């Protein structure tokens, strides 16, 4: 097998030559996920700083070992990293890569992710689940075996299911109905978080989301796991449904597992589409993001600029309402061309409403301004009724 050396972060890794990224490759390595790994290094570093003790990390899908190697080299206060993979070739390459980087605190195991977690119950402070596809079948093992106070880092690449392109796979994997809307990637993350939360609840555990994002072809959630029956029950109150009107774009949220969901839009009389159950609570911790951005300034990351841009956008939208509006979608409904998004945002801000861009969509705005007022504002800007001289 032909190989070559790549450099990422502070490590050098030997990887197999391949024509394209595929789950069928002998050993999986995806260069597109470098930013994913950069974010993970940053978030886990900040987590380690806040817990203020040495940590143990489980990378349950080792591949070439690049994630485990970077965690060892680039995260301060790592006592041990356990890298697992079911592929014997991946295990062999991972071990070579640890030697290549003179790493002694990484243990590489040939093991299924679920078995790896079950055989190390309560031993890991951080569990990283980054499979090719859905993490659904590994979430219960993660929930049952993560140490209380630990950090879970979970990726999903089956975005076609979570975003509503294919409904049945989402129902089958996550027990939720997705919805193909302009904010479908946000819905997808909220479905994923609700699914994780329900799995944790079985073990009287609940989550506090630190950071989440949708980038390229994947979604990623970072959350602290805590324990307690009453607080778990309270955390489940954050799960509910979104009712969306495809006719006028109005939407509303309803909390609970079996709520009375309205069928008709109160604004236009159109029929609602419904998504859920999904997480309606916070999907970002603003203080944690700020502290992580400060920490990133001192890290050696190839994708630092992209990472900081993502953190800044999520920081700005962290206090906003559930879902956002797409200015192009609204203008299409109004049958007008779109004004400059910054002009619209400035006027929303002048009226005292929350307003931010969103990392989910370039043309997206997160605001608590009522939709009918937002539509009229856009029309007024197009008709030049608003402005400093008016």
Curated annotation (Swiss-Prot):
Q: Which PROSITE patterns match?
A: SAM_MT_TRM1
Q: Which GO terms describe its biological process?
A: tRNA N2-guanine methylation
Q: tRNA processing among the record's keywords?
A: yes
Please name the top-level EC class of this enzyme: transferase
SUPFAM superfamilies, per the entry: S-adenosyl-L-methionine-dependent methyltransferases
Gene3D superfamilies hit by this protein: N2,N2-dimethylguanosine tRNA methyltransferase, C-terminal domain, Vaccinia Virus protein VP39
- Supply the alphabetized keyword list: Metal-binding, Methyltransferase, RNA-binding, S-adenosyl-L-methionine, Transferase, tRNA processing, tRNA-binding, Zinc
* The protein's name in its UniProt record: tRNA (guanine(26)-N(2))-dimethyltransferase
């Amino acid at each position: 097998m032909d190989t070559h050396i790549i450099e990422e972060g502070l490590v050098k890794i030997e990887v197999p030559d391949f024509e394209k990224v595929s789950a069928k490759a002998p050993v999986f390595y995806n260069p597109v996920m470098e930013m994913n790994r950069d974010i993970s290094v940053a978030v886990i570093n900040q987590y380690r700083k806040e817990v203020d003790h040495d940590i143990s990390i489980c990378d349950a899908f080792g591949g070439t070992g690049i994630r485990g190697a970077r965690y060892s080299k680039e995260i301060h206060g790592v006592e041990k990293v356990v890298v697992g993979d079911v592929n014997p070739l991946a295990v062999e390459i991972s071990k070579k890569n640890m030697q290549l980087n003179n790493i002694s605190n990484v243990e590489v195991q040939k093991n299924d992710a679920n078995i790896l977690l079950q055989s190390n119950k309560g031993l890991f402070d951080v569990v990283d689940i980054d499979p090719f596809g859905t993490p659904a079948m590994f979430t219960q093992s993660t929930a049952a075996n993560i140490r209380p106070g630990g950090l879970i880092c979970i990726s999903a690449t089956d975005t076609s299911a979570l975003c509503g392109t294919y409904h049945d796979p989402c129902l089958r994997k996550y027990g939720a109905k997705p919805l193909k809307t302009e904010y479908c990637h946000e819905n997808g993350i909220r479905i994923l978080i609700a699914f994780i939360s329900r799995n944790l609840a079985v073990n009287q555990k609940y989550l506090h989301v630190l950071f989440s994002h949708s980038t390229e072809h994947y979604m990623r959630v970072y959350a602290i796991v805590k324990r307690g029956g009453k607080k778990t029950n309270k955390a489940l109150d954050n799960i509910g449904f979104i009712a969306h009107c495809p006719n006028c774009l109005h939407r509303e949220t309803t909390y609970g597992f079996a709520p009375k969901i309205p069928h008709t839009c109160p604004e236009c009389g159109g029929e609602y589409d419904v998504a859920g159950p999904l997480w309606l609570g916070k999907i970002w911790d603003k203080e944690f993001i700020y502290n992580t951005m400060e920490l990133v300034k001192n890290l050696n990351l190839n994708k630092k600029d992209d990472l900081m841009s993502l953190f800044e956008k999520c920081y700005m939208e962290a206090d906003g309402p559930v879902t956002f509006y797409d200015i192009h979608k609204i203008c299409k409904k109004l049958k007008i061309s779109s004004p400059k998004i910054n002009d619209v945002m400035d006027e929303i801000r002048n009226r005292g409403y929350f307003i931010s861009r969103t990392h989910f969509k370039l043309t997206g705005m997160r605001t608590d301004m009522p939709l009918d007022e937002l539509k009229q504002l856009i029309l007024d800007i197009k008709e030049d009724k608003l402005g400093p001289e008016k």
